[in-house]
């Protein structure tokens, strides 16, 4: 049966090649050689016959840059077999194809292309037995690092790549190489904050009042800071039964042991040693626990408030310039969170906290309502700062949603936004995989481009104000290099408005220039208007 399928596929390929000759502009030309420089591996066949990728260190390229695709024949069993190679991009309206015959003596089949259009470019490989492979390449300008006016963050799980083994590393790369490539990719986007959650207290201290091992955290802090980014440290999670408060020892369940409130004396010893070790590190954001109003903390609100105040006091006493904020609250708009916001307001007024954390993961159908409900609570609590949205993505992480959520988070006065999450891992059951905008090989999807576009236009811009804050029409105004930038988007239905007056250039959510007519449709796909 397989031979029959292959026979018919060869015929189909031959027919397609004939018609392709009539339209040479849509064809791909290949070079086959026995020698190739090392290339970034974007995948390989399960049977080890093929490897494929791009020449370079990451999967992101500048507009107009020549990109070389490499397809390597790794086994003589492919000798003489034919394959169809396709290159497609929705943003660039490209659909090209070509054909190769595998040659064991010249195992590297390569082609090059370039494009001035930002977007995702997908290379597909189809064999005569109908087996298919594909990978994505992103084209977008390399961004300047976002400045400190707003934190554009990611949660890339570099700790897992460094410590948890092959299932969490990039395929074909060791732990250190994986960390470097992850951060190089983040650096290309211009993000200025990395949030990590996988180095808990128990990984650093093995016994009460014992020595603290900073090896992994030193690596993380140094690597992130070397890339010009701040490090969001989630300071929390107890270290095992020996570290929990006495009242919880009889009911201690090891499967959720890290969620119990700690013995405060033992905990504060750990915090003190940590604060002393990083006393000169002002590029760390200290987030005290994660979702203390949810399953990550088994204690009462009052137990968290005590932990929060005492921990913040230790940190601020060590260095008053430390940036400290309360743990991001799950389901941030719930009225039951009011006491948490009130405690944050109290500690901000005491100069023990700089801000409060919250998590709004919702999709665009609820984002506007839930954000404004949360802001009503924070206003009622007396908070004078806008918070840090230190996790956002689970309820919606497609290209338009990530862009709109980042935009609206800043529009409502926050100081930071962390897109959750950054990358998939090889381990399929990993809970981050459904929300990532890079896959396990760091191949980007559309959301990577749109998030980078937010940073491209606004990462070094000053927020001037919100012109319209209606669900179906949000207009934000920024200023960058003396130029006004207005961003139009909707968190609800489409709205048609008159096109802006004046001389300007408009861009779509991928950063590609677009023409405007007398009216524009404002949707959940942001439009950036840059005045000349």
Question: For the regions a protein language model found, what residue spans apply to each?
Answer:
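Mature N-terminal, pre-catalytic/accessory segment of carbohydrate-active enzymes
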Residues: 16-173
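Carbohydrate-binding surface patches
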Residues: 55, 468-502, 509-511
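Beta-strand-rich binding/interaction modules
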Residues: 79-90, 123-125, 493-513
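Hydrophobic faces of well-ordered beta-strands that scaffold small-molecule active sites
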Residues: 152-156, 194-196, 231-235, 284-288, ...
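Substrate-binding cleft and catalytic face of glycoside hydrolase catalytic domains
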Residues: 186-349
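Noncatalytic carbohydrate-binding groove/subsite architecture in carbohydrate-active enzymes
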Residues: 301-406, 412
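Aromatic/acidic polysaccharide-binding cleft in carbohydrate-active enzymes
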Residues: 395-452, 466-469
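C-terminal beta-strand-rich structural cap/linker in extracellular carbohydrate-active enzymes
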Residues: 515-532
């Amino acid at each position: 049966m397989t031979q029959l399928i292959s026979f018919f596929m060869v015929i189909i390929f031959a027919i397609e090649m004939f018609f392709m000759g009539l339209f040479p502009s849509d064809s791909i030309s290949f070079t086959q050689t026995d020698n190739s420089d090392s290339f970034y591996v974007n995948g390989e066949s399960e049977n080890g016959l093929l490897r494929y990728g791009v020449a370079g260190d990451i999967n992101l390229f500048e507009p107009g840059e020549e990109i070389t695709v490499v397809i390597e024949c790794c086994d003589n069993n492919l000798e003489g077999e034919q394959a169809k190679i396709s290159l497609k991009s929705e943003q660039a309206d490209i659909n090209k194809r070509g054909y190769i015959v595998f040659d064991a003596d010249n195992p590297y089949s390569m082609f090059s292309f370039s494009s001035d259009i930002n977007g995702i470019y997908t290379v597909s490989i189809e064999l005569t037995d109908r087996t298919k492979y594909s990978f994505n390449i992103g084209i977008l300008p390399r961004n300047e690092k976002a400045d400190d006016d707003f934190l554009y963050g990611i949660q890339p799980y570099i700790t897992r790549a460094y410590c948890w083994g092959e299932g969490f590393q990039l395929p074909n790369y060791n732990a250190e190489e994986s960390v470097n490539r992850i951060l190089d990719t983040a650096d290309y986007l211009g993000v200025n904050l990395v949030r990590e959650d996988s180095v808990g207290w128990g990984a650093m201290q093995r016994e009460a009042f014992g020595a603290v091992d900073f090896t992994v955290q030193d690596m993380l802090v140094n690597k992130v800071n070397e890339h010009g980014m701040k490090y969001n440290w989630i300071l929390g999670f107890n270290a095992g039964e020996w570290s929990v408060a006495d009242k919880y020892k009889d009911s201690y369940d090891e499967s959720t042991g890290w969620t119990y409130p700690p013995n405060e004396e033992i905990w504060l010893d750990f915090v003190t040693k940590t604060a002393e070790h990083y006393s000169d590190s002002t590029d760390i954001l200290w987030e005290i626990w994660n979702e203390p109003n949810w399953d990550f903390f088994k204690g009462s609100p009052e137990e968290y408030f005590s932990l929060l105040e005492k921990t913040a006091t230790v940190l601020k006493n060590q260095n008053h310039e430390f940036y400290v904020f309360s743990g991001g609250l799950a389901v941030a708009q719930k009225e039951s969170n009011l006491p948490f916001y009130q405690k944050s307001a109290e500690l901000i007024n005491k100069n023990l906290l700089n801000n409060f954390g919250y998590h709004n993961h919702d999709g665009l159908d609820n984002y506007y309502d839930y954000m404004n409900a949360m802001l009503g609570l924070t206003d009622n609590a007396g908070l004078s700062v806008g918070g840090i949205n230190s996790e956002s993505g689970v309820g919606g992480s497609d290209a338009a949603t990530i862009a709109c959520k980042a935009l609206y988070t800043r529009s409502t006065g926050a100081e930071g936004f962390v897109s959750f999450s950054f990358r998939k891992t090889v381990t399929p059951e990993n809970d981050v995989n459904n929300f990532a905008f890079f896959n396990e090989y760091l191949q980007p999807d559309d959301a990577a481009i749109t998030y980078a576009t937010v940073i491209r236009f606004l990462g070094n811009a000053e927020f001037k104000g919100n012109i319209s804050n209606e669900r179906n029409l949000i207009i934000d105004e920024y200023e960058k290099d003396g130029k006004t930038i207005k961003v139009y988007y909707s968190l609800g239905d489409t709205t048609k408005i008159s096109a802006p007056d004046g001389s300007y250039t408009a861009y779509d959510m991928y950063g590609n220039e677009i023409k405007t007519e007398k009216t524009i449709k404002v949707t959940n796909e942001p439009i950036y208007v840059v005045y000349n």
